[in-house]
């Protein structure tokens, strides 16, 4: 992989690099790519992941025989979040779909060409649409965005006033498809890769002449957690790549939880072992920590744990 043209401080160059990539042919290869990019620069992986996810969704639709009337060129995002006080609706008239309303958490909307967006088609159902973000009927807000991590990956609302959109699948297809679970673990692969340089810093500290037993304890805790997470990611990729299982959603949530906890462990061990110096004197280290802390908030923490427990309690999730 040659990511020399990609930079966390140059969004346009990063997106141009992302669009030049040929998407990996397997799920495992995709996650490996994302992890390797995140190990180099977390923010670049954060920009690449939704683009690859969008291309994967469009490819999945094609495999299922869904007719999507568009060419998948340019840079893509995936906007599926919901927020209090905001609602994006889709209306159908004379064979044309248009979108109306607001959508929160639209990462890089000002920089991307297009996005796959979920919108409400009635009071209970959402449907996926392809939206041209350069359409004059789309207004991209610049904030609020005061993040210290992922500073350039602005995730603000968009307002849409009648922009024409292309449907991708029927209502509910986006959430029902097997690839929905796959995409969630792709984000976790970014988290995992982003934490590897912190493990390297801990190893360097533990190998120094001034190291004591506590330095080795901090390293061991981070190393063990990341090793377990890698094992889980590999097994999950193998299961999904072989055709999945009857509980792909549960398996994906388990994997994301294991990885998120491993990365949080690594962040904590690095903070305790290395102290404040790299956070104030090492720009790359400080940026990586800040980026990971923001990125990890895509994990739903205790809510995901409650979902896992609920599924298991009702008889799902056999090993």
Regions found by a protein language model. Give the residues of each.
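Buried hydrophobic positions in well-ordered alpha/beta secondary-structure cores of metabolic enzymes
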Residues: 99-101, 195, 229, 275
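Glycine-rich flavin
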Residues: 2-111, 313
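Generic structural signal for well-ordered, non-transmembrane alpha-helical segments
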Residues: 193, 220-227, 253, 257-264, ...
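A short core secondary-structure module
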Residues: 105-140
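Glycine-rich beta->alpha junctions and the first turn(s) of the following alpha-helix
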Residues: 145-227
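C-terminal helix-coil-helix/basic helical segment that borders enzyme active sites and/or dimer interfaces
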Residues: 2-6, 228-261, 268-282
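Hydrophobic packing residues in well-ordered alpha-helices of helical domains and bundles
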Residues: 47, 188, 219-222, 248, ...
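Glycine-rich phosphate/cofactor-binding loops in nucleotide/flavin-utilizing enzymes
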Residues: 277-319
């Amino acid at each position: 992989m040659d990511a020399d043209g990609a930079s966390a401080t140059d969004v346009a160059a990063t997106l141009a690099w992302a669009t030049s990539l040929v998407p990996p042919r397997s799920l495992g290869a995709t996650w490996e790519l994302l992890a390797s990019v995140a190990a180099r620069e977390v923010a670049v992986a954060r920009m690449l992941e939704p683009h690859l996810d969008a291309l994967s969704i469009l490819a999945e639709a094609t495999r299922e025989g869904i007719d999507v009337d568009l060419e998948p060129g340019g840079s893509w995002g995936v906007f599926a979040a919901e927020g209090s006080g905001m609602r994006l609706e889709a209306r159908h008239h004379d064979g044309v779909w248009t979108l109306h309303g607001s959508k929160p958490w639209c990462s890089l909307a000002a920089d991307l060409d297009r996005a796959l967006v979920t919108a409400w088609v009635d009071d209970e159902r959402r449907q996926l649409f392809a939206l041209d973000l350069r359409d004059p009927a789309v207004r991209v807000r610049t904030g609020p965005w005061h993040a210290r991590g992922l500073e350039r990956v602005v995730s603000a609302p968009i307002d849409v006033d009648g922009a024409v959109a292309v449907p991708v699948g029927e209502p509910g297809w986006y959430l029902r498809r097997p690839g929905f679970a796959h995409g969630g673990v792709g984000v976790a692969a970014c988290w995992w890769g982003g934490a590897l340089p912190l493990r390297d810093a801990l190893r360097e500290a533990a190998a120094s002449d001034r190291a004591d037993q506590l330095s080795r304890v901090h390293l061991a805790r981070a190393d063990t957690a990341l090793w377990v997470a890698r094992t889980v990611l590999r097994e999950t990729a193998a299961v999904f790549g072989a055709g999945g299982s009857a509980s792909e959603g549960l398996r994906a949530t388990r994997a994301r939880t294991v990885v998120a906890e491993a990365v949080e462990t690594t962040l904590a061990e690095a903070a305790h072992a290395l102290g404040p110096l790299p956070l104030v004197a090492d720009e790359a280290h400080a940026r990586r920590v800040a980026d990971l802390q923001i990125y990890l908030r895509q994990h739903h923490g205790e809510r995901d744990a409650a979902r896992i427990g609920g599924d298991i309690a009702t008889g799902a999730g056999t090993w």
